[in-house]
């Protein structure tokens, strides 16, 4: 990438600040700050969907995420729901594809992941709701669906317990497939969840999949809600991409989308 292309890409970056505000990342200094943590969020692969090149979509995403890892280490990758498209027979093949990732990865259940809980947990060795701590940062993963593919709000009781357990941690990142705010056609209005998370000032961002046509950062109660486009499926943004998140040494969070080769829509939170 030449200097003009780099500066053009930088102008699209976003920085997420600890007070919930977002600002454009206007200069190279935003990228020059050292990272304390770096991860990728992807979603909506829809492995097995008819009349789509789902195997190619997964192959491209895995290769490009691994390329990011080679460029600068990724501590983890999150696949935020709709790994498969309805048919549980495709679950083993989708896992084999994601096993090509060269960093630890975690998954959440989406509405098209229509798999019995015991099969899901047996396949991924992960619960439907679970937490992980990476470099003293908390990651909370929650289901927003079930074997029927119903749209569900996150498990508020579970999240309340975990947010209270981790209230003294500096940063909490939350991952749920369906956006819990009704600001998109496919979102749902989870008022109890919204009221819960705003009580915890260490919640740095809530990451959503599901809405293939969404690529922005939205703010509610000073909490950023981040979308990541889609890596598969038959609709959505013209590109198939994923989100990169970089926690800086000063605790700013720089985030941008890869489409999946070029950097776009960067922000700091």
Language model regions located:
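Acidic/histidine-rich helix-loop elements
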Residues: 40-60, 85, 114-124, 147-153, ...
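Metal-dependent catalytic neighborhoods of phosphoester/phosphodiester hydrolases
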Residues: 80-99, 115-125, 184-187, 216-221
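Binuclear metal-dependent phosphoesterase catalytic core
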Residues: 33, 53-55, 59-60, 64, ...
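N-terminal active-site segment of His-dependent metallophosphoesterases
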Residues: 18-92
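His/acidic metal-ligating clusters that form di-metal
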Residues: 67-76, 149-224
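N-terminal secretory signal peptides and thylakoid transit peptides that target proteins
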Residues: 1-17, 21
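Active-site glycine-centered loops adjacent to acidic/histidine catalytic or metal-binding residues
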Residues: 44, 81-82, 110, 177, ...
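Conserved catalytic scaffold of divalent metal-dependent phosphoesterases
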Residues: 32, 47, 121-188, 257-260
């Amino acid at each position: 990438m030449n200097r003009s292309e780099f500066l053009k890409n930088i102008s699209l970056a976003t920085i997420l600040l600890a007070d919930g505000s977002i600002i454009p990342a206007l200069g190279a200094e935003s990228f020059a700050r050292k990272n304390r943590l770096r991860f990728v969020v992807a979603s909506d692969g829809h492995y097995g969907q008819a009349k789509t090149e789902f195997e190619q979509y997964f192959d491209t995403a895995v290769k490009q995420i691994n390329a990011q890892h080679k460029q600068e280490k990724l501590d983890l990758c999150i696949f935020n729901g709709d790994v498969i498209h309805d048919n549980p027979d495709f679950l083993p093949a989708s896992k084999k594809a994601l096993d090509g990732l060269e960093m630890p990865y975690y998954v959440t259940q989406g509405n098209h992941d229509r798999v019995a809980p015991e099969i899901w947990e047996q396949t991924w060795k992960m619960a439907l709701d679970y937490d992980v701590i990476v470099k003293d940062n908390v990651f909370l993963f929650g289901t927003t669906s079930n074997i029927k593919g119903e749209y569900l709000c996150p498990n508020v009781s579970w999240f309340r317990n975990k947010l209270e357990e981790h209230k003294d941690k500096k940063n909490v990142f939350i991952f749920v497939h369906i956006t819990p705010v009704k600001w998109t056609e496919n979102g749902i209005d989870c008022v109890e969840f919204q009221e819960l998370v705003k009580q915890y000032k260490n919640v740095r961002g809530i990451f959503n999949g599901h809405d293939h046509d969404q690529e922005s950062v939205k703010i509610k109660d000073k909490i950023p809600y981040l979308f990541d486009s889609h890596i598969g499926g038959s609709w959505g943004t013209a590109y198939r991409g994923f989100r990169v998140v970089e926690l800086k040494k000063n605790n700013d969070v720089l985030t941008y989308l890869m489409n999946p080769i070029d950097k776009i829509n960067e922000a700091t939170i």
